[in-house]
From Swiss-Prot:
Chief location category: cytoplasm
SUPFAM superfamilies membership: FAD/NAD(P)-binding domain (SSF51905)
Sections of the chain in a coiled coil: none
EC number: 2.1.1.61, 1.5.-.-
Spans annotated as FAD-dependent cmnm(5)s(2)U34 oxidoreductase: 282-699
Protein's UniProt name: tRNA 5-methylaminomethyl-2-thiouridine biosynthesis bifunctional protein MnmC
Record organism: Shewanella sp. (strain MR-4)
Superkingdom of the source species: Bacteria
Reactions catalysed according to its record: 5-aminomethyl-2-thiouridine(34) in tRNA + S-adenosyl-L-methionine = 5-methylaminomethyl-2-thiouridine(34) in tRNA + S-adenosyl-L-homocysteine + H(+)
Protein family (similarity comment): In the N-terminal section; belongs to the methyltransferase superfamily. tRNA (mnm(5)s(2)U34)-methyltransferase family. In the C-terminal section; belongs to the DAO family.
Gene of this entry: mnmC
GO cellular component: cytoplasm
Amino acid sequence: MTAKPQKSCQFKRDYPQLINLYPPCALTTAQSLDNLTRLRLSRLTTQSTQPIQGLCVMGQWGLGDGLELLSLLQHWQTQTQTQGNTRLLVKVFEPNPINDYELKLLWDQSQSLISKSHLQPIANAILKAKPARIIGCQRLIFDDGRITVDLHFGDLHTALSQLPHSADHPIQQWLVLPHLAAQLNGKQVWQMARLSTDDAQLIGVNLAETLQQLAHKSGFSTLNVSQDALNGDASDALQSHIITDEILLHERKLLRQQADTAQAFTPKPTALATKDHPIAIVGGGLASANLMLSLAERGQSSTLFCKDNELGQGASGNRQGAIYPLLTPENDELSRFFQQAFLFSRRRIEALSHASMMETEAAPTITAISHDFCGVLQTGHDERSQQRLDKIIQSQDWPAEIAYAVDANEANEIAQIGIDKAGFFYPLGGWVCPFEYAKAAVDKASQLANVQCHFNTEITEIECDAKAWYLHSQGQRFGPFRQLVLANGAQLTQFSASERLQISPFRGQVSHVPAQFKLSQLATVLCANGYLTPSHQGLHCLGASYVKAAEHLDFCPQEQWENLGKMQESYPNQAWVDDIDISDNSARVGVRMVTRDHFPMMGCAPDVAEILARYEQHQLNQQQAEQSKHYWQTTPAPILDGLYILGGLGSRGLSSGPLAAECLAAQLTGEPLPLDWPTLNKLNPNRMWLRKLLKGKAL
């Protein structure tokens, strides 16, 4: 059963409000819109900024009603022959977040797609991706990675200034939409320049002279297009200005260096992956599978080493897992990251599920993913938890597609069983089978790139020799690999190179409960003191225990009773709770790796021995604290070259794992990231040490 969908009244903005924030495309005819898109693409092929290593990166200032974006994506889809294997990444910066419901309302009410019906398929794909009204970047992937759209919502200067520069794949061209052109100032244009190639061009329709001057002063060439030119009436109505000022280009270089120096404590890979050298991945769960898929979408080969006979036998082995974002009252980096990650994972699941239904002779079978986006209903279970939940609800004006408050009657209607208390409903959440998710990701990766999986291969030792990594397993030696990723869950700290990572194992026992009587009517995931899923194949999942440094992974009768007790405490006097039967002693035990700050670990493996050695050298006394802080702030943090960490997903790996894997894949291949510097700093595997060192504190 599926919970009833959220009501449209949850969305606050009507069409007149939307049309003011997202003005219609100035190019009213299909011909003029197509001409603008063709012009943009033709300028790419005439510049030295042709697609770099199979990836073309374009920027867009403003979303408007989205037609310029739709036209670009549609042209890219239909130009398979001319573009070859080149992929497209479009980074759109829009100050006013918008969701799929509002986008559809905008398109329907304006009837803007009626005369441009060729854009309807890609418009439907955008709507299906369900962009949300959240702050930050939302990465949308289409056509098996051939097209990627990054929607950067929120303050424009913040979005630009906090975005890492990609030296290998900078932005090659910008389109400035008229309704936001007046908001561009010198600081923003310089940040755009920092993120761009030195000969990137800024294109716009009827660009103001002041904006063109700003662009020229930061080293941008400009192309000012008139309406007549796009209507095909005056081919000479293109005003192009080429800027080749070496001083301005040097200032751009300094700006990039300053940004890199300011974030030196979050190191970048020292050498990028190449397609003819596979990346080694140790692990067999959701994180490693999604990393393999993200790499494959880039054409990057990889080799997986899994200690079990199939994927998803560790923490990813549960029958059902809840998927929904972690929110905080402050809506801080943690909360914003989990919203971005949850939405990304949800899109992954839907894309893989669609692919599993499209079996052909040319494409091997993709594992079907059991899942139901039936929503997640969160309620308090005691006074303290209720106060915390109330604080989360009341502290922010949460987008309704992320979560909204419900009263007791609405909670009962959503759950289809007696709840009788108010709560917080996550309408896009639900449950998914983690091990099927992992298998589907690897199945899809095998269609896109050269991937290999070694099962029943437990890696017991890793070593670095001459800047290459070798893996040892039962007398076998694998390698050399230029890049090695440790994504092996509970075994993450088993190697000498990773044993000091500040991360802890927690045992979790999930109980399997027969679906019967009123309990079987549950239509949404319940989250209170523990969680309870709707039935799947005749069983509910109830859990989970949370035991640090457990001595064994055997079934524990006490934890089985504790799982039941949590539901009894959360929903007292409800008849359906009496239907929870744990007498079969059916359960599954796994270990999840947890960090103190609840962020996953993603990025370069820290050289902890070198960090401690430098600490002894630079943290000699209190008088040198400021000097030490400056050293750690501006000096690249020590890393183990070629070794990377992807782990610490905790109890919300279904939400956080796929985006963390996507970001690591982008780092390994030198591509632009969908995360900003503050979030990357929080994900940095060295953060527990560097956080103190950057403040001049003792370790």
